[in-house]
Amino acid sequence: MYLNGKSLYESHLLERVLNPQPFPDSRDRGASTYTWFCESDDKNTYLYANFHSQNPNEHLVEINVRDSCFYPDQPGRDYITVCGFRMCHAATQWAAPTAEQIGLIGTHWSKGWIIEHNEISDSKCSGITLGKDHATGHNVWTTDRGKDGATHYNEVVERALKAGWSRAKIGSHIVRNNTIFNCEQTGICGSLGAVFSQITSNHIHNIWTKRQYGGAEIAGIKLHAAIDVLIQHNRIHTAGRGMWMDWMAQGARITGNLCYDNTTEDIFLEVDHGPYLVDNNLFLSSLSVSDMSQGGAFAHNLLAGKIVSRLETGRFTPYHPAHSTAVAGLTNISGGDDRFYNNLFVGPSESSSNAPDWDGKTQRATGFGLWVYDTRKFPLQTGGNIYYNGARSYTNEANALVMSDLDPKPTIVEEGDSVYLHLTLGPGLQKATTTFVTTELLGKARIPNLAYENPDGSPLEIDADYFGKKRNAAKPAAGPFENPAAGELKLKVW
């Protein structure tokens, strides 16, 4: 239900409409007291709503029961372009990775769509879905609770492969230049169906702001099997979790994204084996990276928040031949085998908040800098990293540049439709022992034994910065910006 275009909060009890109380976790607690309730008998459906002092007869009140706004009736509707629409108000269902994922707009297990220059908002769950179909399994855990979620999903992957899940039939979508907001599960999600796609230049915000429910599928962008997917130059904020690459993010490149004001973290990498590349990003929330994977490469990022390093020995997840959906094997996450080159790590404003945070039971380490990887089974490759304001380096890191007495104070300021980053990196930036990042430097991810390369198999190099400015191959600047000034900076980042 909507009042003047703004969705009300659904309640499961009439009492909470008659006597509403603010939802404690909502990011707009005042709005959370505008509530509605529905009940039915054999003949009628009754709707109750609390509009406070506003007379609904004098305002626009809308009721919506549609499961989507634009969604094909069957899989395989390929090569459709959706451009220039304003789409809003859909009663979408929860889009689990083992289910058919129906969004406000969705591709329904197809190939080659272009979704661009649209404004998409107010989905009960997901905005855009690039997900799988019904036939490969639909909420399979509800019919067999004797198996754990990883087993169910591995079986879904096997069924999808038998049904033709491949570059030839699925994925290769382009999602660009859209504005997506007011969705309570994801801005963009896709289980298996987003392979080989490009998600670029989207503004995704106000995701999971009501917080009436939670779950393991909530983010600005949430993908399972981001195989050879490019996620570039997106602005993701006020989204709970910014990006979530869950299972099989092999060959993915996550580059040049702006993330801030995300209360969970900016990016979560879950049970991926590599190779994948995370470069030139601005991770400015209080928790920058949650890493429950291995085999990743992180280069030229600005990480202003904490890092979490976790193992996952209980789940066995797929890895693949290069640039393929075929499964080469299954294994768990022992941790490490990551590469960190030319990054900027910013510590806390108070030294006490960088005290070691170690949970022996879950093998989880949390803190500012790469020390959280010190105990991991597989070593890191490192070089050219700078540690500010108490952020701590990896124990075995050679030539780390530590500037504990300098706080860059990265601050985001929104001015109309533009976003500016204020920070001070100091004159010591040029002292970092940096290296030009290439396929040769990064080597091969241990588990799949594959190189970090472009989706077409050609060697890659990080030859441009966040703004597209050419990098100095002889001595690139650490961080996302090539040759920034030493004084206080004001950079237009969106």
Name each model feature, range by range.
Residues 14-29, 53-67, 100-108, 113-114, ...:
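Short, charged, low-hydrophobicity "junction" segments
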Residues 1-109, 121, 129, 136-165, ...:
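Extracellular polysaccharide-degrading/modifying enzymes targeting complex plant/algal/animal polysaccharides
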Residues 248-249, 256-258, 262, 268-425, ...:
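Extracellular beta-rich repeat passengers
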Residues 64-70, 97-106, 124-166, 182-191, ...:
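Extracellular beta-strand/beta-solenoid scaffold signature
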Residues 78-91, 111-125, 137-160, 167-186, ...:
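Right-handed parallel beta-helix
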Residues 42, 65, 98-100, 168, ...:
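Short, solvent-exposed coil/turn segments
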Residues 188, 197-207, 353-381, 476-493:
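C-terminal/domain-terminus segments
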